[in-house]
Structures are given as C-alpha cells and as structure tokens.
C-alpha cells in the first residue's frame, strides 16, 4: 500500500510491503563544493 510521510523538510513517499517498508524518491543533497569540500 502506498505511504506518504510528511517531514519538516518535505514529503517522503514509500510503500508498505507486508513486513517491510520501501522508500521511493528520497531527495539527495547537493555535493559539497568550494569551501564546503574536503581539502588535502
């Protein structure tokens, strides 16, 4: 059965698959660049 969970940062869509939950379309963060990236 489809699930929709509302979180402070947005909505998370998933599915209840009789015994386990499956998350779909989880938003990802942008990669760290510039001053936010690790330095050697």
Swiss-Prot record:
Top EC class, one word = hydrolase
Enzyme Commission number:
3.1.1.1
Q: Which GO terms describe its molecular function?
A: carboxylesterase activity
- Tell me which UniProt keywords the record has, alphabetically: Hydrolase, Serine esterase
Listed under catalytic activity are: a carboxylic ester + H2O = an alcohol + a carboxylate + H(+)
Judging by the UniProt lineage, the source's domain of life is Eukaryota
Q: Which family does it belong to?
A: Belongs to the type-B carboxylesterase/lipase family.
For this entry, the protein name equals Esterase-4
């Amino acid at each position: 059965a489809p699930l929709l969970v509302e979180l402070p940062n947005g909505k998370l869509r998933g599915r209840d698959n009789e015994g386990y939950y499956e998350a779909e379309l989880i938003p990802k963060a942008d990669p760290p660049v510039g001053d936010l990236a690790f330095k050697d």
